[in-house]
């Protein structure tokens, strides 16, 4: 990863003050998607990092994880598996609940999407608390998949999600860190 490439990616991500509520500085990854060079550079960095690791599946979490996970899976020549909110997947699923700041949420995965021994890379746009990826990791492991790596475009290290995921045995990678919440 060159400093110039990381700078291109980071500068394409807009920061929105007081969204979705007062006191939050929201990192808007959709502005990165609008910049073809930055988006291509993001996928290119992820491909370069993971191309020789032998993954058999890439799992992306709803919804922005799809935007980075699916093109990465195509470039790696492996299948893409979406993890979604309840009721959004048509085939049989398993579910995993996790705690949010103000409540509980649940994620689901198709029961036939991961098979015993699949080597899985988990991808999302942003790492904050790590709750979403912890739940995703539990789903993959419950189906017999091996997951040791999680990749993010953005990390908010002050919130501590990277430490939470490392405690689960995940190697955490992010392209750029941002200060704050």
From Swiss-Prot:
Signal peptide: none annotated. The keyword Glycosyltransferase applies. It is found in: Cytoplasm. Its EC number is 2.4.2.7. The keyword Thylakoid does not apply. One of its GO terms (cellular component) is cytoplasm. Pathway: Purine metabolism; AMP biosynthesis via salvage pathway; AMP from adenine: step 1/1. One of its GO terms (molecular function) is adenine phosphoribosyltransferase activity. HAMAP family: Aden_phosphoribosyltr. Homodimer. This is Adenine phosphoribosyltransferase. It comes from Vibrio parahaemolyticus serotype O3:K6 (strain RIMD 2210633). The lineage of its organism: Bacteria, Pseudomonadati, Pseudomonadota, Gammaproteobacteria, Vibrionales.
């Amino acid at each position: 990863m060159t400093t110039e490439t990381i700078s291109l990616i980071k500068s394409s991500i807009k920061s929105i003050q007081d969204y979705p509520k007062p006191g939050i500085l929201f990192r808007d990854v959709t502005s990165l998607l609008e910049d073809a060079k930055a988006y291509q550079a993001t996928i290119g960095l992820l491909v370069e990092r993971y191309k020789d690791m032998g993954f058999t599946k890439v799992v992306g979490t709803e919804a922005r994880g799809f935007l980075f996970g699916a093109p990465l899976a195509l470039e790696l020549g492996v299948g893409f598996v979406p993890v979604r909110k309840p009721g959004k997947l048509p085939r049989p699923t398993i579910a995993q609940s996790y705690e949010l700041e103000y409540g509980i949420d649940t994620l689901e995965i198709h029961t036939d999407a991961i098979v015993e021994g699949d080597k899985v890379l988990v991808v999302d746009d942003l790492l904050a608390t790590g709750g979403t990826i912890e739940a995703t990791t539990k789903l993959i492991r419950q189906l017999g998949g091996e997951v040791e790596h999680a990749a993010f475009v953005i990390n908010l290290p002050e919130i501590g999600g990277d430490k939470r995921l490392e405690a689960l045995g995940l190697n955490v990678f992010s392209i750029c860190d941002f200060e704050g919440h």
